[in-house]
């Protein structure tokens, strides 16, 4: 038990350091830290034998056993995965061993193990999402337009301008038309990928997401889906779209944002930040909520609701330099020019967010 306890504590410390210093995720850091403290408290409560005094490191037969070479650690994801697995195995060993001495404690070790499973998924997901969405600070929500030709012109013009993330969102489309528009957008994006395969990432096709209709996203092979806080739970959405596609989640308060992280979302949409011309809200999000999310959570986070070019500065001041927009682009006389202006401003803001709490203008 002493060896397993040491192994678990060491593994948790490595995971904590990785999410703290590499991912810079305050929320996950707090979760791992609390888990580590809960393990220490449980071990202290369950110290039926003075395990420190019974320790015999020099006489441990396992100390001289040579195992196969450890899996290489090439990325932060490798580091987190290896040490989370080490911690989970150690907690399982503790759970089984304590059944011989004090069975009443077994379920508590099991609870710690399942908490680590959830943290591992969230941390690895955060690292993957950060890589997938690196350099993407604008998501444009596109409607179905009046006909297929108008839709194709819109999508092509946005991609040509440099937009790399679009979300198909049109509550007025029937299922058949939504499927047709999604196929169009995917074909345009994939063709552009092929044409610009040897060029910089900024010249390549966009990530194509589907709003709400996770079934359409999965069936057509879209890059992901975005769901609201009142839609299917995140864990069920993940079952539908699979592990490889991006899963976005809207959060209206800190609790929803934290839950989305631990449930496996890849990115967040937070707000509404301002009154919107495309969707009605009971109230706008408080600046304190937006600032807390920007400060605590490392998942790519997009400000939503009433975003305009003139409002980007106030969002950057509270730490949000990614935005999702609809009418600011699609409702403009020249959508491509509107998108280009947003991209230019966001590029200048991305390095100087302050996380200050103040009013939004």
Regions found by a protein language model. Give the residues of each.
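Glycine-rich phosphate-binding active-site loops on the catalytic face of alpha/beta enzymes
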Residues: 164, 169-171, 229-236, 269-281, ...
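Acidic (Asp/Glu)-rich catalytic clusters
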Residues: 155-161, 187, 191, 201, ...
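Alpha-helix-loop-beta-strand connector modules within alpha/beta enzyme cores
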Residues: 179-196, 201-212, 229-252, 281-309, ...
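Catalytic cores of alpha/beta
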Residues: 208-223, 252-266, 296-303, 307-325, ...
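Active-site mouth loops of central-metabolism enzymes
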Residues: 76, 134-152, 245-251, 303
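Active-site beta-loop-alpha junctions enriched in small/polar residues
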Residues: 141-145, 171, 213-215, 230, ...
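Structural preference for solvent-exposed beta-strand-turn elements
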Residues: 1-130
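Glycine/Thr-rich beta-alpha phosphate-binding loop at enzyme active sites
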Residues: 172, 177, 220-227, 248-295, ...
